[in-house]
């Protein structure tokens, strides 16, 4: 886990319908990605203290919220359910309790969670339960339910901050079949990210008319595995080829 979080400042100047003069709204956007169960400042595998965990990020975010209040947007970009013994315990042993990954995401008050390939790796019983336990929506516009033809989880969310309407679109690398057996993702298929982004950008712009569109993709910048069926790391392609994004955040490749 080389890259746990990124913080960006988005300053917007726009004309409010209720005001004659334009005004500037500053939003602090925080992304965490590829946490791999590093919730606490201790490595339970190697049995030693651990830096760069969500415990530290939580302190940082709490400090930001003192200044920016509700203008802090906190986004989790996948691969959170797997990686430490604490995850294994709640995924497969103490399955009656709420998953620790849900407790942490809820405690930190994330605005949205994106699916990662290692989240899919845990299997339906684990991630379907986890989705229900979260206070925020899980996003994955290109994760398609094969029975309905619709996204398996929410494709996007709308956030409102000081009159600014923000759309957040989430996607997952479609290379899942390269790594995981079908029993782990039965009833699902994974669409090409560029095609999916074009489709949902049109829907979002026509239906929601947002001031800002943020893409949050559990897919690397570029490269990775490329086959006739899928492209593993397509975040840069989406940013270049799909007009409308004000910010694109990516993960997966650490």
Task: For every predicted segment, state its role.
Residues 6-15:
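Bacterial N-terminal signal peptides
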Residues 20-254:
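Acidic, metal/ion-coordinating pockets
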């Amino acid at each position: 886990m080389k890259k746990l979080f990124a913080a960006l400042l988005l300053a917007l100047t726009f004309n409010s319908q209720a005001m004659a003069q334009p005004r500037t709204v500053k939003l602090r956007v925080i992304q965490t990605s590829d946490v791999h169960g590093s919730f606490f400042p201790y490595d339970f595998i190697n049995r030693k203290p651990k830096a760069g965990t969500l415990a530290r990020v939580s302190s940082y975010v709490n400090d930001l919220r003192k200044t920016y209040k509700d203008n802090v947007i906190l986004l989790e970009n996948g691969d959170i359910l797997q990686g430490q013994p604490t995850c294994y315990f709640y995924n497969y042993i103490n399955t009656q309790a709420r998953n620790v990954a849900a407790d942490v995401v809820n405690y930190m008050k994330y605005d949205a969670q994106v699916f990662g390939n290692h989240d899919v790796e845990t299997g339906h019983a684990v991630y379907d339960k986890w989705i229900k336990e979260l206070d925020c929506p899980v996003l994955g516009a290109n994760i398609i339910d094969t029975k309905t033809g619709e996204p398996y989880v929410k494709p996007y969310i709308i956030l409102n901050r000081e009159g600014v309407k923000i759309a957040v679109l989430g996607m997952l690398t479609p290379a899942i079949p390269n790594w995981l057996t079908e029993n782990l993702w039965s009833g699902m298929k994974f669409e090409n990210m560029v095609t999916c982004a074009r489709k949902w950008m049109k829907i979002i712009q026509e239906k929601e008319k947002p001031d800002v569109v943020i893409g949050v993709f559990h897919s690397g910048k570029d490269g990775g595995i490329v086959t006739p069926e899928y492209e593993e790391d397509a975040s840069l392609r989406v940013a270049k080829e799909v007009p409308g994004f004000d910010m694109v955040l990516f993960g997966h490749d650490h």
